[in-house]
Swiss-Prot record:
Gene3D superfamilies the record matches: NAD(P)-binding Rossmann-like Domain (3.40.50.720)
Region (Required for mitochondria translocation): 2-82
Source taxonomy: Eukaryota, Metazoa, Chordata, Craniata, Vertebrata
Subcellular localization: Mitochondrion
Cellular component aspect of the GO annotation: intermediate filament cytoskeleton; mitochondrion
Superkingdom of origin: Eukaryota
Residue positions binding NADP(+): 74-80, 125, 222
InterPro entries recorded: 17-beta-HSD3-like, NAD(P)-bd_dom_sf, SDR_fam
Family (UniProt): Belongs to the short-chain dehydrogenases/reductases (SDR) family. 17-beta-HSD 3 subfamily.
Oligomeric and partner information: Interacts with STYXL1.
N-acetylalanine modification, residue list: 2
Organism of origin: Pongo abelii
Name this protein carries in UniProt: Inactive hydroxysteroid dehydrogenase-like protein 1
Amino acid sequence: MAAVDSFYLLYREIARSCNCYMEALALVGAWYTARKSITVICDFYSLIRLHFIPRLGSRADLIKQYGRWAVVSGATDGIGRAYAEELASRGLNIILISRNEEKLQVVAKDIADTYKVETGIIVADFSSGREIYLPIREALKDKDIGILVNNVGVFYPYPQYFTQLSEDKLWDIINVNIAAASLMVHVVLPGMVERKKGAIVTISSGSCCKPTPQLAAFSASKAYLDHFSRALQYEYASKGIFVQSLIPFYVATSMTAPSSFLHRCSWLVPSPKVYAHHAVSTLGISKRTTGYWSHSIQFLFAQYMPEWLWVWGANILNRSLRKEALSCTA
């Protein structure tokens, strides 16, 4: 009995001495919970403010804000074409850049006839190196370029391990995904700075959020574009230039064509037209956005999840996409 009493007294003394530490830990826990809760609430408020509230009012006058002409690279299909059409629907004249002259002529005529705007084309293969940029610079030098959309990009044929990627494809990813955006900005930015207005939209990818296995070179190139855009915004915001890093997740383009699963999830994987309509409405509002409401939800989950969980999910998804793509080519 004496032993029980002694243990009870010892327990009370220890509990009393630890009480202040327990209270401190409780305060830390309460502070952490409150901080995380406020962050989540603010993130969802930002999502609503960005993707839903602007749609209730009138559309922004992009010509007045930025200028009369927009340049869109990789503009003959997918997000690039849809983005060009959306800008044209708002009255901007469009200069389309791509490597296929026949497709460029068709798209330019469609846009001009549908939206009653001026269009121009520049034939350029961004994978061919530095020599293409002098003709582009000459073609654009007398234009009031208000918006540049860096959309041109190269994707993997399907998700695969780095050593399975051909050397030619790797060079294309570097030249097109990284060099093209950087040099196109170098071409148009001086004119924007001189006029003290302009917007640069660079299309990155949701795969830049965290290391993405089986898309290693592609996701790294898109991470470059994201950081490049954010740094430019800090450099040139004071000069009247708006720079946006656009971070889409999957959109129903030719890049996702082999996957029947992705094309079934239309609310997660919008069409290029739907995506571009939403994305253009964020121009001038958000410097870094996914451009589409369901992609913003995916981005929030990606931000909060640990890296190991992202990698695990990416491996499962990319293995499935590779298997489906290979079965289509078999």
